């Protein structure tokens, strides 16, 4: 069966961690694997890091820059050189490619989100492999994807992928960094319920030239599996592992997918929008929205965190801070704070008007099923 496959390769796998020099042998092996997947009829997307590292090498810069403007300029230098290498290698195998540069605000706008989906579908029909990266040159720091692990998971959700492979500098997920703790236990398979509860010392940062550590890969796994995408982590310098995992071999760490929602708009609410704040709920509200499919009312809200406006996205959390759902609010954070814990009929008297009886209508509310099930079934 033909499948849609997203592969993300990190800077640590593409380059030497000390010098930033590209590992052409790894890139060539990756290109060969992706071309084989495409020749077999699969739809293939590559999310490639490395632009900043390659740019630093090209300009003789020894350390990854910290200033945003400098990093964006260096990314512009590196992205062109990186794409030239990919194009040369894919062309030698007769495989056409396309470059897609995304920013978070584009995916937050529903029309742009749909346009991006349509572009990917058109490329698939043309037999093209899309190579994706964040458009660092114009990205706003506060609205960046943050790392390509997150970007790859969001792309996988957007295009309704079957698989997301994250290629990194370790062979699988461990209970701690195996480079620092040799006794760290390997983790072969993670269910949605286990992922919701997973708490390990995964490290907070990546290599010198990259931005993503194992913690970002777990965050990506939560996004991808919640969107119905199977995800695997495996060693980046062995791209052939992708084919072996798809053939059923027990390599790397595999994260089991949840059932995918058929509602494309709700997938956009869950993963396309960037939450601007948090709303904490009492037990009754949690049961009503998670088990009863109800809208969120003011009465069930105990706390509001962050500043946001009406029509923006927020996270819905239990009292311990675990995220249960996401939704688009009908009121601002200030207004919700004023009406929290009150019955809906009091909204007009408290605010002087009533924009809606609900804080979040159920049509604009998405349950993140594994976490909500875990929370509501607790104790």
UniProtKB/Swiss-Prot annotation:
Substrate binds at residues 49, 136, 148. It is found in: Cytoplasm. The keyword Cytoplasm applies. Keywords: Amino-acid biosynthesis, ATP-binding, Cytoplasm, Kinase, Nucleotide-binding, Proline biosynthesis, Transferase. ATP binds at residues 8, 168-169, 211-217. The keyword Nucleotide-binding applies. Pathway: Amino-acid biosynthesis; L-proline biosynthesis; L-glutamate 5-semialdehyde from L-glutamate: step 1/2. Residues 276-354 form the PUA domain. GO terms for biological process: L-proline biosynthetic process. InterPro entries: AceGlu_kinase-like_sf, Asp/Glu/Uridylate_kinase, G5K_ProB, Glu/AcGlu_kinase, Glu_5kinase, Glu_5kinase/COase_Synthase, Glutamate_5-kinase_CS, PUA. It comes from the Bacteria. GO terms for cellular component: cytosol. It catalyses: L-glutamate + ATP = L-glutamyl 5-phosphate + ADP. It is an enzyme of class 2 (transferase). GO terms for molecular function: ATP binding; glutamate 5-kinase activity; RNA binding. Its EC number is 2.7.2.11. Catalyzes the transfer of a phosphate group to glutamate to form L-glutamate 5-phosphate. Belongs to the glutamate 5-kinase family. PANTHER family: GLUTAMATE 5-KINASE (PTHR43654:SF3). NCBIfam families: proB (TIGR01027). This is Glutamate 5-kinase. It comes from Microcystis aeruginosa (strain NIES-843 / IAM M-2473). The gene is proB.
């Amino acid at each position: 069966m033909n499948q849609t496959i997203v592969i993300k390769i990190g800077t640590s796998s593409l380059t030497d961690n000390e010098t930033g020099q590209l590992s052409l042998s790894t890139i060539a092996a990756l290109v060969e694997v992706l071309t084989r997947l495409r020749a077999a009829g699969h739809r293939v997307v590559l999310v490639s890091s490395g632009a900043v590292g390659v740019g630093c090498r090209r300009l003789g810069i020894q350390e990854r820059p910290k200033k945003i403007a400098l990093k964006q300029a260096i990314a512009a230098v590196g992205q062109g050189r990186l794409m030239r290498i990919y194009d040369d290698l894919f062309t030698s195998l007769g495989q056409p490619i396309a470059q897609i540069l995304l920013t978070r605000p584009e995916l937050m706008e529903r029309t742009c989100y749909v346009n991006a989906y349509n572009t990917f579908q058109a490329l698939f029909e043309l037999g093209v492999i899309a190579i994706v990266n964040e458009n660092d040159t114009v990205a706003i720091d506060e609205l960046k994807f943050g790392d390509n692990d997150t970007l790859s998971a969001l792309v996988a959700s957007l295009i309704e992928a079957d698989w997301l492979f994250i290629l990194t500098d370790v062979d699988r997920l461990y209970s701690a960094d195996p480079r620092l703790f040799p006794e760290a236990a390997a983790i072969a398979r993670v269910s949605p319920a286990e992922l919701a509860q997973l708490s390990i010392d995964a490290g907070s940062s990546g290599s010198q030239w990259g931005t993503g550590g194992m913690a970002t890969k777990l965050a990506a796994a939560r996004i991808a599996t919640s969107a119905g995408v199977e995800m695997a982590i495996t060693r980046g310098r062995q791209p052939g592992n992708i084919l072996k995992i798809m053939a059923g071999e027990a390599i790397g760490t595999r994260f089991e997918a949840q059932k995918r929602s058929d509602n494309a708009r709700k997938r956009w609410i869950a993963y396309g929008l960037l939450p601007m704040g948090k709303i904490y709920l009492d037990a009754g509200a949690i049961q009503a929205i998670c088990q009863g499919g109800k809208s969120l009312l003011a009465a069930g809200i105990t706390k509001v965190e962050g500043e946001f406006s009406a029509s923006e996205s927020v996270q819905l959390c239990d009292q311990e801070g675990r995220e249960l759902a996401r939704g688009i609010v009908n009121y601002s954070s200030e207004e919700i704070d004023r009406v929290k814990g009150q019955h809906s009929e009091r909204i007009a008297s408290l605010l002087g008007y009533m924009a809606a009886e609900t804080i979040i209508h159920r049509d604009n509310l998405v349950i993140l099923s594994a976490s909500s099930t875990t929370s509501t079934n607790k104790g």
